């Protein structure tokens, strides 16, 4: 990799570290190419990204970013998983690490907060941003639905009473 390519990579990584809300660092020693492809596809489906970069270049790219607290974790064969959703990368990384013991989560950073491996695992148990939005919408809609049911209930009861009265009148006429 020539000097210009390294500078481009550092600039790209710096932009990523500046804009993402979560970065997970893990050792990937022993993962096969098929395993890495599977991990990348799972991350992509969740809206996250996996990047393998030289630790030295990643250290340079971390300067001046909120997630600079992950610098001590960049030793050995490390990969960086990141996402704008604070939970997506952590969920996929933890789930993949459970299924494949060769992926070892070292820690991460959420904004300026450094996370140890247990912190990343705890973060992975939280619902995603989309799930939280769906719950909030459901909570907001539930009272409106109940109000509509309460308002419509007397009218429906009256309609049933009139219907039953009409049916009884028809049976009386037929008899």
UniProtKB/Swiss-Prot annotation:
GO terms for molecular function: large ribosomal subunit rRNA binding; structural constituent of ribosome. Disulfide bonds: none annotated. Pfam families: Ribosomal_L10 (PF00466). One of its GO terms (cellular component) is large ribosomal subunit. GO terms for biological process: translation. PROSITE patterns: RIBOSOMAL_L10. The keyword Phosphoprotein does not apply. Belongs to the universal ribosomal protein uL10 family. Part of the ribosomal stalk of the 50S ribosomal subunit. The N-terminus interacts with L11 and the large rRNA to form the base of the stalk. The C-terminus forms an elongated spine to which L12 dimers bind in a sequential fashion forming a multimeric L10(L12)X complex. PANTHER family: 39S RIBOSOMAL PROTEIN L10, MITOCHONDRIAL (PTHR11560). Forms part of the ribosomal stalk, playing a central role in the interaction of the ribosome with GTP-bound translation factors. This is Large ribosomal subunit protein uL10. It comes from Methylobacterium nodulans (strain LMG 21967 / CNCM I-2342 / ORS 2060). The gene is rplJ.
